[in-house]
């Protein structure tokens, strides 16, 4: 009898817990992290093996991933690139969600030489919009592509109007990294937090007025869709007033992460996203919009942001493990979407976990 395929999940943080718990139902899963408390949470609730591991130590990482068929890299962004490199050097297939600043394609030659599948940016955004772009670029002529995502709380307080729904360090990266987008086929670089606009949303039985601003979320799409989609933009949703508060922090030199910016995982939070495609099909104008609205899960206690990110990752992991996706080298999420059947499989996987993307087409 053939045993279950083995997976090692590096990182037992908010998203790492979701990933390990989801995969543990069908695979032999080990979670590696520095925190015994985080590992105990998993092992007490799910059939997950655990290993206390210093993920900043390359040798420790190499030892942790040795006996496995697939690695999930769910470490903080500042550790992501080097951790991914270590995984590839060890010849292990990997799905990564760490959202690091470096260019993942710098590891493409290494991954190919090691005969490794290295899927990167397989989270909520980047991630889910990219799968759709990869799929739809073969079905229509896309002229404009935009996605806006935000993790928020129903009841906000204070001038900041916001509590992080993921790592405060990674949130601050969004606010300080120059934002790149594409207009008429040309790369435009803008300051972060620039070009804010108010958007009214009617979604999930709620009405919101949110502020959207430029962030650097296109990432690999700048390469994979170059010359294929002439206009692309990514923005982030916050409640009105938050951007002005962040700018005041930056201008006055106040602490880069306020003390009260503790990631909040509670019943009050939600994640919202709007994805828009404009173009033509067979010479006729075509518009496709996707909307997603997800809240805290009372069954697992996992936050919406953790679930959407984690289940996007586990959807890709299943595509790799069952052979649906097999391209060697660095694979951004749009590559995965371009393989027939993969995007549909991932979104069916999300739907089965109550992550719903509503499609509106004209």
Report each predicted region and the residues it spans.
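Conserved acidic E/D residue at the C-terminus of a beta-strand in Rossmann-like folds
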Residues: 31-34
